[in-house]
Swiss-Prot record:
GO molecular function: actin filament binding; structural constituent of cytoskeleton
Subcellular location: Cytoplasm, Cytoskeleton; Cell projection; Cytoplasm, Cytosol; Cytoplasm, Cell cortex
Keywords, sorted A to Z: Actin-binding, Cell projection, Cytoplasm, Cytoskeleton
GO biological process, one term: exocytosis
Assembly description: Component of the Arp2/3 complex composed of arpB/Arp2, arpC/Arp3, arcA/p41-arc, arcB/p34-arc, arcC/p21-arc, arcD/p20-arc and arcE/p16-arc. Interacts with carmil (via the region between the LRR domain and COOH-terminal proline-rich domain); carmil is required for Arp2/3-dependent actin nucleation. Arp2/3 complex, MyoB, MyoC, and the alpha and beta subunits of capping protein all form a larger complex with carmil.
Subcellular location, principal: cytoplasm
Gene name tied to this protein: arcB
Domain of life: Eukaryota
Reported function: Functions as a component of the Arp2/3 complex which is involved in regulation of actin polymerization and together with an activating nucleation-promoting factor (NPF) mediates the formation of branched actin networks. Seems to contact the pointed end of the daughter actin filament. The Arp2/3 complex is involved in organizing the actin system in cell motility and chemotaxis, in phagocytosis and macropinocytosis, at late steps of endosome processing, and in mitosis.
GO cellular component, one term: pseudopodium
Membership in a protein family: Belongs to the ARPC2 family.
Alphabetized Gene3D superfamilies for the sequence: 3.30.1460.20
Any Pfam family: P34-Arc
Protein name (record): Actin-related protein 2/3 complex subunit 2
Amino acid sequence: MLLLETHNRILYDEVISHFEGDRRVNNIFADFDGVKFNVQTSDDKSSLMVSVSLHAAADLLKNGGSALLKSVYGDMLQAKPEGGYDVTLVIQSSFSGNKEELAKKVSLLKRHLVAAPFLMVFEGIEAKKPLPEIIAINYRTDETFYLKPQGDNVIVIFDIAFKDADDVILSKIFLQSFVDVRKTISNVPSITFSQKDPPLELKGVKGVRAGQANHGFVSFVLFPAHIKKPQESADLIQTFRDYLHYHIKCAKGYMHTSMRNRVESLIQVLNRAKPEPVNTVKRTITGKFFKQN
């Protein structure tokens, strides 16, 4: 199975190209979850501005995002983002340090923003700090994920909108593999899936989408062993939704390919079974023609 990268390769290449070339850049491109990037060079080419917009920006920034971005990007982080975007970084062309490390850091902008609530909760549990009872991140127009600290554990609940009933079925089959793995490996997160009805941990929480046919709730319980590896755990859990949908699409593609191959083989069998047409003209071994009735 594929593990998705947490950095944006296009953004990485744009930053590297800015330092290697003498050209103006003004590119807009997308990432998973409706994320939009805008990369543009200043008029005098003295700096490169990188902006990002995403649906969950407000929730993420108030739940650890602002503090994390400030600690990672320092003076590059602008107090007032570009119009129409949620976060803006400005990279000076005169930067003389390791440009590849800088490009990698900038390419992780979305990762740091989305990982912030997880890291905030992990740190709070480790330091025994008071934490909100539940944190809701509306990361898409019709989807939310929730973080619920519970003693030394964290429950992460994804409210996922599926395209149709077929996707719901495929997701159940796919998620069963996580359950099966837990039977042989003891330190993997506990996982449950429920359709329509939200888990009990969301009882009384406002805005929960209950009773919708093509919605499902995937719950992970992260244990102390996972919390002690905050960066790795944040990387894996924040890409889960995209990871799930990617493999649903792969499963559909595999089934469609298998069906096409099966149809082609059946057509070949039928073609071989066709009777030869009557009144055909054939050639003998000596080259003469004769008509067969």
